């Protein structure tokens, strides 16, 4: 049976619906950086996802292409993730009416056996087979550290209510949010918005924190 990160690491992908502090270890990702409204039809964000998934599935199917990756085992491609910032909001807050001002890093987790050289091979393979330029897809290591996380159920636009609960929890725990250029609002998308009802969408929300 293929290794499924969502099931094997439930502490990272299936948190409770109430906020909790957790320490996240460094992980490797495929990543694409961009700016703009993620809801724009055929916009930069949607195009980035095509490149990201193209490389992710090429790596997963590498054996069938004759690529021998040391330590390879069968796995389920992990869920889409995103790091989000908004121009003019150094505290990490969001004005959901200004989605054009968003900056994002879209990511898919990589198994530890995947190297940067393997990613470069997959990028070239996608270019060769699909004539899709994936040169902006990068091997990205994110060292998240101490965070508060929660399972948000519902619309992405209703996230402020959940984030308010997280902020209250942090105050109770003697912590504050700790946003910076390297510690960023993080979301993991467990539902496909094209298939799931809006009120049932599952999104892991993580906010970097520090103790005071």
Give the ranges of each region predicted by the language model:
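A solvent-exposed interaction/effector surface
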Residues: 1-212
